[in-house]
Regions:
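Membrane-helix entry/capping segments
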Residues: 2-11, 15, 51, 213, ...
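Hydrophobic alpha-helical transmembrane segments of multi-pass inner-membrane transport and secretion
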Residues: 15-41, 273-308, 335-336, 416-441, ...
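Intracellular coupling helices
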Residues: 6-22, 26, 291-334, 396-407, ...
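Small-residue-rich transmembrane alpha-helices
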Residues: 32, 36, 241, 252, ...
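Alpha-helical transmembrane segments
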Residues: 29-58, 349-358, 427-455, 735-743
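Hydrophobic, regular-secondary-structure patches
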Residues: 44, 53, 58-116, 123, ...
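Mid-to-C-terminal secondary-structure elements
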Residues: 118-134, 145-275, 472-655
């Protein structure tokens, strides 16, 4: 019997190829989109879950209180880890992680600057699951000058030699011995590194700060079995105050597996990666629903043409139960074929999708089994619902009435299809409007004026003892025609940190805690970055006090001080007691996702970490070569290493750009699926009304009138979908935009454009079938009447 059902189903597929293609392809594309998005979402959700101790791992974070506002910080003081472990019951172990990049590593004739180095406590390799291919994780980081490297680094420096025991020289002075080789760090680890060095080395080199008021490093803890997060949070809440009584900082633990999706830094909690997971999950659901609606719509429409088949089967002895099983089986087989085809599409497209998403995606992702089981369930449900109309309605017909042609599709079935079309286009419109707003917001952030010029600007890290040659290098560069300006700073201008270090000015409430961005700079900073001044002047060598005694602040500081003019006012901050000589116009010194906060800069040449060089526009290659030639002349022992500031910004928003591209693709596919369904439905509607069209043409109806008649119903359904979608999209996207400090407007043109696109899609889908029906010779439609 089952074999017979399959044979009949295959026969129907080949007999009605167009219908079968539209129905199966639409559902398959929808399922494939859902699977691809699900794999991406599951990969996002899988971050850091591969660690054996993942459920008991946490990052220590801070909530700093400033004038009623909370500044959330993910870095902590250097000595916090051991102290919190020793003094807090329930904490099993602690590990500190410090970024220690920017080191020159040399082995024989190979020398490279390495940026992806972490200095960690020895407990790091016991707490976290980062297996070693060579070496012992329990002892690999015990010696201060030991080094654990990745396979890639081992190949880079030692080729096919055994790296164990080899000596690498750091910054031409300190020798480190390779004591371990790491397996490749999984891509779904938020901690990424190529090398691990002992934290003890930093202490020995005097590169740590024992103050509990300085936040620079990450601190991770592992809880004892059976200890709850709430218990430990209660114990550590006021820990900083036991060391710094004047502090307004609280501690809390962040579950390690939540860091990738839910971490935030600063005053405002932005949407973060979790928001995009929610968006893509909704898109996957919408696309799948649209595809399933298509399938059910076309199946019920097509079944109306099979009444005579039902009559003939009953005449030759088929029972109603046989027909019910036949229609259910046929519908489920159709849906199953679509599922198999979807799996094949995903397998074929996964490499390209991985490249587009910049991820290592595969079927082997945690949770995919549950998704597949769910999709199989949806396949069966869709097949059963789509088969219910022919199985239960058509199978109840009396053969005599069917064969006389006196049975017609009821109003209930027609209205059901109309409801499905409206629902389908409502979802499509939500996707179109939502994707447009998301893409518009991403474009707005990337195009937003920063308040300083990032074009043709490079920065050079002043690593190791390069800093000693800074002034000589600057003097050589400023004489070059390819260079328009040279300066230095302790931070790159797109990532200036904030500080709460004892700010004061006349009239300030001593109890008022404020957080101010701070960067040490060199002369020519304002001019090189092309920052606009609102009041006062830039730093000048002509003023002796400008060296470590003068401040330039932004408009936010001036507003904080509450005075019309702050130039000439006394101002103290981070141990510098001086005077404000100028006010800069506000500029973005962190991500454009963040609100511009107060900022102060001061000339302190000893604290410079970066050289900033503005190249002459035009032949950038020649300008870079000129800078490199000067570098090699002044600092021959170190390779020339630089970054373009605008490329840094591109990297900063690259993930969001990729997400915007993915949103566009999936929305286009969703609309395409809706088009397929509407095209098929229009075809069957025209077929059902063939006789009516013939009569109308005999009575004098023109081709345009008949075309309008057939298109009108679908246009009205799409307009109704707009009425339903607009308020949902407006309130949904308005809420989403509130996650951003600086956001684009929710223009009414977006909604009008979405409506126009939906109507255009409907016209393109329906008009072909309508025109074909309208130009048909009425004699063909009425020849049997």
């Amino acid at each position: 019997m089952i074999k017979n059902y399959i044979v009949v189903t295959l026969r129907n597929i080949f007999k009605h190829k167009g219908y079968a293609f539209i129905n199966i392809a639409g559902l398959a594309i929808g399922m494939a989109c859902c699977l691809l998005i699900s794999i991406w979402v599951l990969d996002e959700l899988s971050y850091d879950r591969f660690h054996e101790n993942a459920p008991s791992l946490y990052r220590v974070e801070e909530n700093q209180h400033y004038s009623g506002r909370i500044y959330h910080v993910t870095v902590t003081p250097y000595p916090l880890g051991p102290a919190i472990k020793d003094e807090t019951a329930g904490i099993k172990d602690a590990a500190r992680v410090v970024w220690a990049g920017g080191q020159l590593l040399r082995y024989q004739d190979k020398a490279f600057f390495e940026s992806n180095i972490r200095a960690v406590d020895p407990s790091f390799l016991q707490m976290f699951t980062f297996p070693l291919l060579k070496g012992d994780k329990d002892t690999a980081l015990d010696a201060p000058h030991s080094l654990v490297i990745s396979e890639e680094i081992a190949q880079k420096y030692f080729s096919d030699e055994d790296p164990m025991g080899k000596v690498i020289t750091v910054n031409n002075t300190i020798e480190f011995t390779v004591t371990g080789v790491l397996q490749k760090v999984p891509h779904n680890s938020h901690l990424q590194f190529d090398m691990l060095a002992p934290y003890a080395f930093l202490e020995k080199a005097g590169r740590t700060d024992q103050s509990f008021g300085s936040n620079s490093i990450f601190t991770f803890v592992q809880l004892e079995e059976g200890v709850t997060l709430a218990e430990v949070n209660e114990k550590i809440f006021g820990f900083i105050r036991t060391r710094e009584p004047q502090s307004a900082t609280d501690l809390e633990l962040m579950p390690y597996t939540r860091i990738h999706l839910h971490q935030h830094f600063g005053f405002e909690k932005t949407m973060g990666a979790a928001g995009y997971v929610y968006i893509f999950s909704i898109i996957a659901f919408f696309v799948l629903i649209i595809a399933c609606i298509n399938f059910m719509n076309l199946a019920t429409a097509r079944s109306a043409n099979r009444a005579k088949e039902v009559g003939l089967r009953k005449v030759v002895g088929a029972l109603r139960s046989h027909l019910i099983r036949q229609f259910y089986s046929e519908s489920v087989i159709f849906a199953t074929i679509a599922l198999v085809l979807a799996a094949a599409i995903v397998t074929l497209l996964l490499p390209a999708f991985s490249s587009l998403a910049d991820k290592e995606l595969s079927w082997n992702v945690s949770g995919i089994g549950a998704i597949l089981i769910g999709l199989i369930g949806i396949t069966l449900f869709t097949g059963i619902v789509a088969g219910s109309y022919p199985a239960l309605f058509l199978s109840s017909f009396q053969p005599v009435k069917v064969l006389r042609g006196s049975i017609k599709s009821g109003a209930g079935a027609t209205n059901f299809r109309r409801v499905l079309v409206v629902f389908q286009f409502t979802l499509s419109l939500l996707l179109i409007i939502g994707t447009t707003v998301v893409f518009k917001q991403l474009s707005y952030m990337q195009a937003r004026k920063l308040g300083w010029d990032k074009e043709h600007l490079i920065y050079i890290p002043l690593r190791a003892d390069i800093k000693q040659s800074y002034q000589a290098l600057k003097e050589e560069l400023v004489r070059d025609q390819h260079v328009l300006g040279v300066t230095g700073s302790s931070h790159i201008p797109s990532n200036i940190g904030s500080n709460s270090g004892g700010s004061s000015w006349e009239g300030k409430d001593p109890e008022q805690a404020v957080l101010i961005g701070f960067s040490s700079v060199d002369f020519d900073y304002i001019e090189t970055l092309k920052i606009e001044m609102k009041e006062g002047r830039a730093f000048s060598r002509e003023h002796q006090s400008d060296l470590s005694k003068s401040f330039i602040v932004n408009e936010e500081v001036a507003e904080l001080m509450g005075k019309e003019s702050v130039v000439g006012e006394r101002f103290s901050f981070v141990g510098v007691d001086g005077q404000i000589v100028g006010v800069m116009k506000n500029f973005h010194f962190q991500s454009v996702r963040e609100v511009i906060e107060p900022l102060a800069i001061v000339v302190v040449p000893d604290r410079l970490q970066y050289m900033l060089v503005r190249l002459a526009p035009g032949d950038i290659t020649a300008s870079l070569q000129a800078v490199e030639n000067t570098w090699e002349h002044v600092i021959p022992d170190y390779p020339f290493d630089y970054r373009f500031m605008d490329e840094d910004f591109d990297r900063m928003y690259r993930a969001e750009s990729r997400i915007g591209t993915l949103l566009n693709y999936f929305t286009i596919l969703a609309v395409l699926i809706a088009c397929l369904g509407l095209f098929g439905l229009a075809s069957f509607t025209a077929e059902q009304r063939t006789k009516e069209i013939g009569i109308r043409k005999v009575l004098g109806a023109s081709v345009s009138q008949v075309t309008y008649l057939l298109c009108r119903e679908f246009f009205l359904l799409v307009l109704l979908a707009n009425v339903l979608a607009w308020p949902l999209a407006y309130f949904g996207m308005k809420s989403w935009l509130e996650n951003y400090a600086y956001r684009t407007g929710l223009s009414w043109m977006i909604f009008v454009a979405a409506m126009a696109l939906a109507l255009l899609v409907a016209l393109a889908s329906v008009s072909f079938q309508a025109l074909r029906a309208a130009v048909t010779n009425p004699a063909r439609a009425l020849k049997y009447e």
